[in-house]
């Protein structure tokens, strides 16, 4: 029961943040996340989260001067591209009987 309340609150918060980000920004954002949990007799837990964000924006400004005899055009191009690497976090916990024997510092 407590977990479902927490999950609903988390989903609501993430929804509000995503709506706020989409309204505030006019750039293109691509995000992907994946999580994997594996538990066995040796109790190894692996959590992997990868996020890749690519942002690009471009603007073109054209200025013409009507007072001169020949038409002069100034075209300015702006282009920005940002790519961030994915982040991987790995947690390994050993709970087996063999690994407990190796942890004792008394003997």
UniProtKB/Swiss-Prot annotation:
Claim: Lyase is one of the keywords in the record: no
Compositionally biased residues, Low complexity: 24-69
Superkingdom as given in the UniProt entry: Eukaryota
One GO location term (cellular component): extracellular region
Region of interest called Disordered, as start-end residue ranges on this chain: 24-107
First and last residue of the signal peptide: 1-24
Intracellular or extracellular location(s): Secreted
Tissue: Salivary gland specific.
InterPro entries linked to this entry: Ng_1-3-like (IPR054054)
Compositionally skewed regions (Basic residues) per UniProt: 70-107
Record's keyword terms, sorted: Repeat, Secreted, Signal
Region described as 4 X 8 AA tandem repeats of T-S-A-S-A-T-T-T: 31-62
Repeat (Sequence) residue spans along the chain: 31-38, 39-46, 47-54, 55-62
KW Flavoprotein (keyword) present: no
Chief place of localization: secreted
Protein family membership: To NG-2, also to SGS-3.
Protein name: Protein new-glue 1
Lineage per the UniProt record: Eukaryota, Metazoa, Ecdysozoa, Arthropoda, Hexapoda
């Amino acid at each position: 029961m407590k977990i479902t309340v927490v999950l609903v609150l988390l989903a609501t918060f993430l929804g509000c943040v995503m709506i706020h980000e989409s309204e505030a920004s006019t750039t293109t954002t691509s995000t992907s996340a994946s999580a994997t949990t594996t538990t066995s007799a040796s109790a190894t837990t692996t959590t992997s989260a990868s996020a890749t964000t690519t942002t690009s924006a471009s603007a073109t400004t054209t200025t013409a001067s009507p007072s001169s005899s020949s038409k002069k055009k100034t075209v300015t191009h702006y282009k920005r591209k940002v790519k961030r690497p994915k982040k991987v976090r790995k947690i390994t916990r050993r709970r087996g009987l063999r690994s407990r024997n190796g942890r004792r510092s008394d003997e």
